[in-house]
Amino acid sequence: MPGSEDLRKGKDQMHSHRKRTMFTKKQLEDLNILFNENPYPNPSLQKEMASKIDIHPTVLQVWFKNHRAKLKKAKCKHIHQKQETPQPPIPEGGVSTSVGLRNADTLPRLPNAAHPIGLVYTGHRVPSFQLILYPNLKVPANDFIGHRIVHFGCCRDPNIYCLYPILESQVCAPSFHSGSPACSSNQSRER
């Protein structure tokens, strides 16, 4: 039937599949360099970059979109794997978990603008650690004893936290300050 052959050609033209783009090693290197410089290039920059590495601007746009999604997926998978790591069991006769504020006289010397908010987690006989939030301290001013914790993209928390070893004898009356921002796994998954 001559009519059915024409119908089939029209159907093929409507649903033609685009062939997969194969990038050369040099193009991939260039794309990764460009992505590291700017993961969200504007349309004029996309055209310029595409002409430099000899690909169509739409192909470049799709590669950037896919690469951002790939990195986001890998980041979420990494965070999810960290959350699934088993916690060490509390030794027999261990001290029950308590949360409280650290004595102010045991804090390291701080800049005048910093007011620490600390939580103590003691669940073992060995020394535990205290996480202290410095809400007004954006850039470390002094060398503190302990470890600085700065968030890099896992949440929108611009604060700096310091982790200090603490002994149970330094724990005050139990209290909890819920006003300190924290990076939750829900926030990480939403972004």
From Swiss-Prot:
Its main location: nucleus. Keywords: DNA-binding, Homeobox, Nucleus, Repressor, Transcription, Transcription regulation. SUPFAM superfamilies: Homeodomain-like. SMART domains: HOX (SM00389). Signal peptide: none annotated. Residues 16-75 bind DNA. PROSITE patterns: HOMEOBOX_1, HOMEOBOX_2. Residues 1-20 are annotated as: Disordered. Pfam families: Homeodomain (PF00046). GO terms for biological process: regulation of transcription by RNA polymerase II. CDD domains: homeodomain. GO terms for molecular function: DNA-binding transcription factor activity, RNA polymerase II-specific; RNA polymerase II cis-regulatory region sequence-specific DNA binding; sequence-specific double-stranded DNA binding. It is found in: Nucleus. Gene3D superfamilies: Homeodomain-like (1.10.10.60). The keyword Transcription regulation applies. GO terms for cellular component: chromatin; nucleus. Residues 1-15 have a biased composition (Basic and acidic residues). The keyword Protease does not apply. Belongs to the paired homeobox family. Transcription factor that acts as a repressor. This is Divergent paired-related homeobox. The lineage of its organism: Eukaryota, Metazoa, Chordata, Craniata, Vertebrata.
